[in-house]
From Swiss-Prot:
It holds the Pfam family Thioredoxin. Keywords: Disulfide bond, Electron transport, Redox-active center, Transport. The lineage of its organism: Bacteria, Pseudomonadati, Pseudomonadota, Gammaproteobacteria, Pasteurellales. Disulfide bonds join 32-35. Belongs to the thioredoxin family. The gene is trxA. Transmembrane segments: none annotated. PROSITE patterns: THIOREDOXIN_1, THIOREDOXIN_2. NCBIfam families: thioredoxin. This is Thioredoxin. GO terms for biological process: cell redox homeostasis. Residues 2-107 form the Thioredoxin domain. GO terms for cellular component: cytoplasm; cytosol.
Length: 107
């Protein structure tokens, strides 16, 4: 997959939990300034990490169950998930280089 995938609460298990590669899950909202800043960064990273990490986004305004399950209180919150388990969390936007380093450290 070379582009960011938008998911919802109903898709979570099939897309994230059952994934055979790590997932970078971005919890975001359309009104969130830092979320808007990180969106193009995620779009750039998706093809660079194709086959190694799947980048997915979930709108917290439209989906409350999954963010609540993970205790998301601030956005953007990025979770790196491997084999259905959270292995790293990043709250807040990062520049592309730092976000790529965050991913590489945990995959």
């Amino acid at each position: 997959m070379s582009e960011v995938l938008h998911i919802n609460d109903a898709d979570f298990e099939s897309v994230v939990v059952n994934s055979d590669i790590p997932i970078l899950l971005d919890f975001w909202a359309p009104w969130c300034g830092p979320c808007k800043m990180i969106a193009p960064v995620l779009d750039e990273l998706a093809p660079e990490f194709a086959g190694k990490v799947k980048i997915v986004k979930m709108n917290v305004d439209d989906n409350q169950a999954t963010p609540a399950q993970f205790g998301v209180r601030s956005i953007p919150t990025l979770l790196l998930i491997k084999n259905g388990q959270v292995v790293a969390t990043q709250v807040g936007a990062l520049p592309k280089t730092q976000l790529a380093n965050f991913i590489n450290q945990h995959i």
